[in-house]
């Protein structure tokens, strides 16, 4: 299925039903009083997160959503039927913005919890409501009010505990395949990953976390180059970022310069991302079989980046070092969630 993480739609809540103008006209009550009933409220529009959805593609084909209008009141003091509410299912992690003002209306991250987006119109009042001691035959009613109408911008931000950063072909997709049940596409060319992918990493029968793989970044991504700039927003909800570096690139490029280019793109896009815990993952150590050469390369990268946080040396394709990495991630995530509780 095509991955779509942005959509523009219009929603319109139902109009309230009009109040009824009516008088009792029965065989033995020739001059009966007013009996016009109120209208029904218009249907409201709710958004609800569903774990079964992972893309906004449905909103590319259906762009207008309208709730049911309330029915008008009737004689005999009968109230009009309320318009049926409309509940729109969206993926977990959907942000709902007012497209005209840019205001964030809702961050829908709890499955099964309806969130009101557009309020239905209020019902009109029948003439019975206006009966008084000085006005026994009121001919006054009120119409139902219009429901709220909004132009919306939907933005999906995937919910993941761990985000993978790196240049194309750094081995991010290979890593997520190695440690989870994800079937991310892997090939020996840049931009194999075209949209964010999620993998559930299970470290024990009762402990797991979610890892997100986004398309590789290139220099100038913050200004729109490559593919990754569209998906940097998906890293905003993560607890920790893994900076994946190819320790022995086949094109002979400098891993330190490559890593600095990625950090520069993060700084330009959103400096707050740099405040998250970031661990360095040096991948493809299998490409340097000589232990001394490998250790010298690792130390030169750490020194060149002036890296102070945790460093893991792994071979994703051979799953070397991946278990230790996953256990350390689970421990950090547990600690962060406990501190937030």
UniProtKB/Swiss-Prot annotation:
Residues 128-150 are annotated as: Disordered. GO terms for biological process: ribosome biogenesis. Its cofactor is Mg(2+). GO terms for cellular component: cytoplasm. GTP binds at residues 166-173, 191-195, 213-216, 283-286, 315-317. InterPro entries: G_OBG, GTP-bd, GTP-bd_Obg/CgtA, GTP1-OBG_CS, GTP1_OBG_dom, GTP1_OBG_dom_sf, OBG_GTPase, P-loop_NTPase. Residues 129-149 have a biased composition (Polar residues). It is found in: Cytoplasm. Residues 1-159 form the Obg domain. It comes from the Bacteria. Mg(2+) binds at residues 173, 193. One of its GO terms (molecular function) is GTPase activity. Keywords: Cytoplasm, GTP-binding, Hydrolase, Magnesium, Metal-binding, Nucleotide-binding. Pfam families: GTP1_OBG, MMR_HSR1. Its EC number is 3.6.5.-. Residues 160-334 form the OBG-type G domain. PANTHER family: DEVELOPMENTALLY REGULATED GTP-BINDING PROTEIN-RELATED, MITOCHONDRIAL RIBOSOME-ASSOCIATED GTPASE 2. Belongs to the TRAFAC class OBG-HflX-like GTPase superfamily. OBG GTPase family. Monomer. An essential GTPase which binds GTP, GDP and possibly (p)ppGpp with moderate affinity, with high nucleotide exchange rates and a fairly low GTP hydrolysis rate. Plays a role in control of the cell cycle, stress response, ribosome biogenesis and in those bacteria that undergo differentiation, in morphogenesis control. This is GTPase Obg. It comes from Legionella pneumophila (strain Corby). The lineage of its organism: Bacteria, Pseudomonadati, Pseudomonadota, Gammaproteobacteria, Legionellales.
